[in-house]
Amino acid sequence: MFQHSATSLQQLPEVARCHMASFPDSFGTKLGLAYSKKSLQWFLAGENRFLFHITDEGRVIGYCGGFQSTGLGDGSTSGMMQYAMNEAAMGMFRKPWLFFHKDVIRFYPLIIKNISRKITGSKNTAVISPGGINLITSIGLVVIGVHPAYRGKGCFELLMHHFEKECKERNATKMTLSVKSSNTRAIVAYKKAGWLNTAETAKAIEMYKTLDV
């Protein structure tokens, strides 16, 4: 029987292993367990973030994490990268060919900026959103994954149900996400769950779903 629970620090290794099994070819997985665990730990380091998982007889089979922005400039991608910078550096030191991985090349500007912040000790200061853009009532779905052995068995729908419930409890009126344009399976699943397209490029699709609170 599937069970839902908020993820604790002690449960991060199992959630990270589920993440790596769900995305075996991703850059984060190639960096190793230490990086995957640390990047997911970012969701436990702030009140405006959350992480939960689904288990089947004690085994983690799916997970989901969200982020509620407090203003412009406090993005989840940069935050996770900076939080797990040491683990990323160690992973790339052991596998230097990852410096030429397509995902690393794409994030070179962001990586350089985060390294600079790490050296200088400066923090990314959020700017309060201008009138007309209410980021605080919007929550982003940042990470979600289902173990390959449990796809098509209702785990994804359960994750989406609890994500939506968590967003409502945080008084959000809108949920957002970004998905790769090539991830057809995920796009179909999101649309089936009521998500709509808001923007589209050759590489990614931005989606949203409004909430009745």
Name each region found by the language model:
Residues 72-138:
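Conserved acyl-donor/pantetheine-binding loop and adjacent beta-alpha core of acyl/acetyltransferases
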Residues 143-146, 152-165, 188-192:
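Conserved acetyl-CoA-binding loop-helix of GNAT-fold acetyltransferases
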Residues 41-53, 68-76, 114-115, 140:
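A short helix-loop-beta-strand connector motif used in the catalytic cores of GNAT acetyltransferases and
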Residues 148-153, 157-159, 168-174, 210-213:
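Acyl-donor (CoA/ACP) binding surface of acyl/acetyltransferases
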Residues 53, 59-68, 130, 140-145:
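Conserved beta-strand in the GNAT
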Residues 173-184, 193-194, 200-213:
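C-terminal "cap" of GNAT-fold acetyltransferases
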Residues 1-34, 59-61, 68-95, 99-100:
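Short amphipathic alpha-helix that is part of the acyltransferase structural core
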Residues 137-142, 167-178:
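Conserved GNAT acetyl-CoA-binding A-motif
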